[in-house]
Amino acid sequence: MAGHSKWANIKHRKAAQDAQRGKIFTKLIRELVTAAKLGGGDVGANPRLRAAVDKALSNNMTRDTINRAIERGVGGGDGTNMETRIYEGYGPGGTAVMVECLSDNANRTISQVRPSFTKCGGNLGTEGSVGYLFSKKGLILVESADEDALTEAAIEAGADDIQVQEDGSVEIYTAWEDLGLVKDGIEVVGFKVVNAEVTMIPSTMVDLDAETAPKLLRLIDMLEDCDDVQNVYHNGEISDEVAALL
């Protein structure tokens, strides 16, 4: 597993995400409804739904709102046929970018995604152009803990890898289907999970300087502002020194 901190990338974007929480909630609800519609409302038997619930909780969505979304999905939703679509491309500095969308209209979605790449000096690629650089994983963050005890609990629960970061936080990687099981396994013995999500982990990283980093962040902002875009993944790495200049 690459030795970078995925959570560092999440943290430096959190303020911007908080500013558009309403749009984030809309996207989370769309995923909850779709996951329940496709796989049923039992989180124990539906890994996609469990991952959606964990992500919603990490974003402070109430249980009541989550349950209503699941009930909508089990009841068939609103009749629209939402499909997951993955677009791949290259961003500033030669970064690899994957865009996960949930949409009922492919033409509308591509008309949102393609201009974002073009305006930021990137280009949309073909299927498979950068996907091979990423692995779908579950990622759990524990801010600080007894490293040995947490490692033992995580391995016992089925974790694939554990990484301790410089700030003392611990990142736990799992098979994406096992995210909920591992999260439960470490919480039941007393560890507090700060964040749990299914994500795409890059196998190699591209270091970004103070000139290129803002361009990539602008691309991510533009993509995340598209209604059909659920998640944006990339392999750009922004050091603490560069982040301090942004």
Curated annotation (Swiss-Prot):
Claim: Cytoplasm is one of the keywords in the record: yes
InterPro entries: Integrase-like_N, TACO1_YebC-like_2nd/3rd_dom, TACO1_YebC_N, Transcrip_reg_TACO1-like, Transcrip_reg_TACO1-like_dom3, YebC-like
Matches recorded under Pfam families: TACO1_YebC_N, Transcrip_reg
A GO CC term assigned to this protein in UniProt: cytosol
Origin: domain of life: Bacteria
Main location: cytoplasm
GO MF annotations in UniProt: DNA binding
One GO BP: regulation of DNA-templated transcription
Assigned keywords, A-Z: Cytoplasm, DNA-binding, Transcription, Transcription regulation
Gene3D superfamilies, sorted: 1.10.10.200, 3.30.70.980
Subcellular location: Cytoplasm
NCBIfam families, sorted: PRK00110.1, PRK12378.1, YebC/PmpR family DNA-binding transcriptional regulator
HAMAP family, A to Z: Transcrip_reg_TACO1
Similarity comment: family membership: Belongs to the TACO1 family.
Record's protein name: Probable transcriptional regulatory protein HS_0508
Source species of the chain: Histophilus somni (strain 129Pt) (Haemophilus somnus)
